[in-house]
């Protein structure tokens, strides 16, 4: 293979990975306002990165067998999950007991990770049809998503210290609006 072609493919996949990672950054920004500890930030970033490896790989495999209709469905499912997470965070911000219905650990982290990585499944579907290099693709998708999730979570954590009690409601509003963006053709 020509070195120029390989560099071009790496740059193209890196741009895609960055675009998909920006979803995770935006959602991480909202989730970071939920008073997370550093080990939670690390864990969330790793889990999001892993899901951005698993989902496009699954998409690439499925892309060989399925039509493009599933791509649109994945976006709607991801939007609905983010909508639910956003509403939960807004409700929890007004809940005086401090309990969260969906929290960023355990099953809540799983729901969060699936929500932000469903779009990478759709991209994987498309890339599976074009025959891109799976190892390079999933490595870049996972790396970019993990790093951008950490950046979003840490920035959200800083904003949380500035906004105090209102930060979780703001974080929920960010997730809610991002979910609506995925659900509605705006």
From Swiss-Prot:
Compartment annotation: Cell membrane
Pfam families xref list: Mntp
Residue ranges crossing the lipid bilayer per the database entry: 5-25, 41-61, 72-92, 107-127, 135-155, 166-186
GO CC, one annotated term: plasma membrane
Entry keyword annotation includes Transmembrane helix: yes
MF (Gene Ontology): manganese ion transmembrane transporter activity
Keyword Transmembrane helix annotated: yes
Keyword annotations of the record: Cell membrane, Ion transport, Manganese, Membrane, Transmembrane, Transmembrane helix, Transport
Membrane topology category: Multi-pass membrane protein
Annotated family: Belongs to the MntP (TC 9.B.29) family.
Role this protein plays: Probably functions as a manganese efflux pump.
Name of the featured protein: Putative manganese efflux pump MntP
Organism for this UniProt entry: Bacillus licheniformis (strain ATCC 14580 / DSM 13 / JCM 2505 / CCUG 7422 / NBRC 12200 / NCIMB 9375 / NCTC 10341 / NRRL NRS-1264 / Gibson 46)
């Amino acid at each position: 293979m020509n070195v120029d072609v390989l560099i071009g493919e790496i740059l193209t996949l890196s741009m895609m990975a960055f675009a998909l990672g920006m979803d995770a950054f935006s959602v991480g920004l909202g989730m970071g306002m939920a008073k997370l500890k550093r080990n939670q930030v690390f864990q969330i970033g790793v889990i999001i990165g892993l899901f951005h490896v698993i989902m496009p790989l699954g998409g690439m495999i499925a892309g060989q067998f399925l039509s493009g209709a599933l791509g649109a469905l994945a976006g709607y499912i991801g939007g609905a999950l983010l909508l639910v997470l956003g509403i939960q965070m807004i409700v929890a911000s007004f809940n005086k007991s401090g309990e969260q219905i969906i929290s960023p650990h355990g099953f809540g982290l799983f729901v969060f990770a699936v929500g932000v990585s469903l779009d990478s499944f759709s991209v994987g579907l498309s890339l599976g049809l074009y025959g891109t290099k799976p190892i390079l693709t999933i490595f870049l998708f996972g790396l970019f998503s993990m790093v951008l999730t950490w950046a979003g979570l840490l920035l959200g954590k800083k904003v949380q210290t500035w906004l105090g009690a209102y930060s979780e409601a703001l974080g929920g509003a960010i997730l809610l609006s991002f979910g609506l963006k995925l659900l509605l053709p705006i």
